[in-house]
Amino acid sequence: MGQKVHPHGLRVGVIKDWDAKWYADKKNFADNLIEDQQIRKFIKKELFSAGIAKIEIERSAKRVKLNIHTAKPGVIIGKGGSGIERLKASLKNIIAEKNVLINIVEVKNAETNAQLMAENIAAQLEKRISFRRAMKQTIQRAMKAGTLGVKTACSGRLGGAEIARTEQYNEGTIPLQTIRADIDYGFAEADTTYGKIGVKVWVYNGEVLPTKKVEKKEEANA
């Protein structure tokens, strides 16, 4: 069977950027990597209702900066910034002996963000809404918002069926093999009474073309 490469990993360094922006030697690399995973897992669990699309981590010698991309910045910031301070205090258990800086980045259009779309479908499945209805409505909203193509897939015991299967719906174009194509990808899991259901979403936002340098040629006066 044909397998699909991760759309983000395929494009890193070409049109996509790294989510972890730091360098470490062999001695500290594994510790930093595990710490990154723990930070992401903790923030996702603690602030699930805030609609977190992405967490970027930047490191220096004595500082860790977190860029949290969220659809609901007010939920994280809290009244007078109390939410940020509370989050910093909680992260001290994971990040030892380093200053923590938290930067909140607002996701302006949650309906076209693949990760938030996947989490939205998963949340609907947990509320016993039909997977077909959840996927089709999400696709319709994204297409209305101006995306060029959307593809969704749900895998597991759909509708409580005894045999697990995968169902997909798509609209528009999704050029997965085109490196310059800006493909956003999201994954989420729904915990249902019949087990887990995996949700994948691909969103095509157009091509990212290199900027052409226009050289102005001055005509020599005769």
Curated annotation (Swiss-Prot):
Domain (KH type-2) ranges: 39-108
Cellular component, GO annotation: cytosolic small ribosomal subunit
Keywords: Ribonucleoprotein, Ribosomal protein, RNA-binding, rRNA-binding
A GO biological process held by the record: translation
GO MF terms, alphabetically ordered: mRNA binding; rRNA binding; structural constituent of ribosome
Family according to the record: Belongs to the universal ribosomal protein uS3 family.
Subunit structure: Part of the 30S ribosomal subunit. Forms a tight complex with proteins S10 and S14.
Role, per record: Binds the lower part of the 30S subunit head. Binds mRNA in the 70S ribosome, positioning it for translation.
Protein name in the entry: Small ribosomal subunit protein uS3
Organism annotation: Clostridium perfringens (strain 13 / Type A)
Gene field: rpsC
